[in-house]
Amino acid sequence: MAVSAPPVISATSSSAGVPGGLFRAEPLYSSPGEPPRLTPNMINSFMANNHNGSVLGGGIGGGSGGSSNTNTNECRMVDMHGVKVASFLMDGQELICLPQVFDLFLKHLVGGLHTVYTKLKRLDISPVVCTVEQVRILRGLGAIQPGVNRCKLITRKDFETLFTDCTNARRKRQMTRKQAVNSSRPGRPPKRSLGVLQDNARLLPHAVPGLLSPGLITPTGITAAAMAEAMKLQKMKLMAMNTLQGNGSQNGTESEPDDLNSTTGGSESSWDKDKIQSPLAASGPQHGIAHAALAGQPGLGGAPTLNPLQQNHLLSNRLDLPFMMMPHPLLPVSLPPASVAMAMNQMNHLNTIANMAAAAQIHSPLSRAGASVIKERIPESPSPAPSLEESHRPGSQTSSHPSSSVSSSPSQMDHHSERMVMMPNNREELIVDQDNGQSIKKFQRDNKEEVPAQIPVMKSPLDKIQLAPGQALHPGFPGPFIFADSLSSVETLLTNIQGLLKVALDNARIQEKQIQQEKKELRIELFREREIRENLERQLAVELQSRSTMQKRLKKEKKAKRKLQEALEFESKRREQVEQALKQATSGDSGLRMLKDSGIPDIEIENSGTPHDSAAMQGGNYYCLAMAQQLCSA
């Protein structure tokens, strides 16, 4: 599947019903929320190697990828308000990617994508759901974020209606807030007092060049922190300029504010300029952006071209794909790092490109450099590349190009006629003077005259500026660059952060293991305590049962003892009675003896009834003997 690139559509043709000053065909500055863009020529050369169904960046599938209708899967790059957006042709209608245009045009107007869907329902607009192949293509191009598996398409007319509705709603909110602020009624302060000021195309002051860089502009506008950082940067820049102008005389040509804005950097991505690879490039010198691994051709004054090896290497590293957001000023646009590992991979790619650039510069002969202007080795990627070893001499009209953009206007060619390059093997610099002929001058580095300026986020480019007596910087001295050493420091910082994260992760794992071990030990101890408690409960139950048994036995013993005591008392009473009877019997025997002794015959006694008494006495004696035997046996 080949992605065709239609001709560039002018911004006026697609901006009907939209305020004219809101969008620019070539804006002076591009915020990180705005994705970089590819020119049609670059897209054609980019897709030439992938015509046979190869995968672009792991995202664009070939024509044999399971879709019967290849026309609906043909992605086109169209111009929408001066920005290249992805579109598909379905049923004769041109449909553009809704999440992409939301990030580009609607993100600063509404609260989120859910608000857009609510407005679409209210406006009776139904977007078209993308197929799997279309989502894969958009994800490969970077129109949608990695990991997104669904997307919707919308027509141009519906988008213009939606944009007009969002703009009107925002104006109403602003008017309501102004009325609330001006009114004397107490209430809640406005929600976005320091948020979005005006449209991003009209945010930047044109009187002070280089005040704001795109790394400081958030996708939703300029925040208070960004403004403070910009003012701090501008103050440091002005101090450095005053110091450098005091050490030497100024020998440059004054530039216009537009030229200064074009040379201060951070304005546009390398995809913004369609003139880089246009046929007009061969007619005269054009200060375009080249890849880090390239040098200018000796006999041509046009833009440098790409050889297939370097182009394939850069394309495999995803360094010139469009539509990628920039989540942080120091991290590249081409790959939004969802993790530290992704950022580290990107830094490794940048280091590889830096090595390639150094090798290409070392092996390039000096005789070929004398015949033409030596091009700066600035990468075409909008990301801060480590190969920006461009040195600036104050005595010549040097151009100060940032790592993200270079303006190709003719007025810039008038002010920048000399190009310089630094040789990495020694500490000398070669300056080619185009106006005075093919003469090469050597200047030794003077470390005493270097003016370092510390910038909070990145190293100052003033560390690489070499001064000589009687020389001064160009008036349009740009904002800070990011050189190889600053990128190495960033890489070191990211490596340290990754190490800290790894240590923190290891500590968290160790703590989690310790917690799990403690939980296991506590669980085992709890089981032991439960077992001991159950054993004690069993023993207590047995003891209670034995106690109840003993109590029952004790009651029985007490009852038996009571019965025995009662029987003993009864027997003691009987014994006393028997003893009394025996005493009475003994007393009766003594009376009989006295009668015998007195001479009374036994017959009278028997006649008087004494035999009956004697029989009773004998029975009592027998009873006493029986009771005595029972007591003895007991």
Curated annotation (Swiss-Prot):
Its main location: nucleus. Residues 488-568 are annotated as: DACHbox-C. GO terms for cellular component: nucleus. Expressed in embryo, and at lower levels in the newborn. Residues 244-269 have a biased composition (Polar residues). Residues 76-162 are annotated as: DACHbox-N. Residues 396-412 have a biased composition (Low complexity). It is found in: Nucleus. Residues 494-588 form a coiled coil. GO terms for biological process: development of primary female sexual characteristics. GO terms for molecular function: DNA binding. The keyword Transcription applies. Transcription factor that is involved in regulation of organogenesis. Seems to be a regulator for SIX1 and SIX6. Seems to act as a corepressor of SIX6 in regulating proliferation by directly repressing cyclin-dependent kinase inhibitors, including the p27Kip1 promoter. Is recruited with SIX6 to the p27Kip1 promoter in embryonal retina. SIX6 corepression also seems to involve NCOR1, TBL1, HDAC1 and HDAC3. May be involved together with PAX3, SIX1, and EYA2 in regulation of myogenesis. Belongs to the DACH/dachshund family. Interacts with SIX6. Interacts with EYA2. This is Dachshund homolog 2. It comes from Mus musculus (Mouse). The lineage of its organism: Eukaryota, Metazoa, Chordata, Craniata, Vertebrata.
